[in-house]
């Protein structure tokens, strides 16, 4: 999509600190980190929500989830990490291109709203 921030990053139109890239995904440093280590794993196909993905996009998300553990050392995830996929504005989604937050580098608690 021409107005999507992540599509522009994928296309190289907007700079980002790339940690990994292949034909299915790009992993970048978050510009507004919520943890010591905060990365975004972004599938290269544009869709907003898990409920919207087709089979090809579902395979792409699966490949993202399988790739993240292989990058533990490079991303500083060795002591544990959290994956978050926000679904919709009320859940905290601010860029409406599905992406996986990868958070690590500190002990994380859990305080439900």
What do these predicted regions represent?
Residues 1-113:
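HIT superfamily nucleotide-processing domains
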């Amino acid at each position: 999509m021409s107005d999507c921030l992540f599509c522009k990053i994928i296309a190289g139109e907007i700079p980002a600190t790339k940690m990994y890239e292949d034909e299915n995904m790009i992993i970048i440093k978050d510009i507004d980190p919520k943890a010591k280590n905060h990365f975004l794993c972004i599938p290269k196909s544009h869709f907003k929500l898990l409920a919207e993905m087709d089979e090809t996009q579902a395979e792409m998300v699966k490949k993202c989830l399988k790739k993240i553990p292989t990058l533990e050392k490079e991303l500083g995830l060795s002591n544990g990490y959290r994956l978050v996929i926000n679904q919709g504005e009320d859940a905290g989604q601010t860029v409406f291109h599905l992406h996986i937050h990868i958070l690590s580098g500190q002990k994380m608690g859990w305080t439900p709203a």
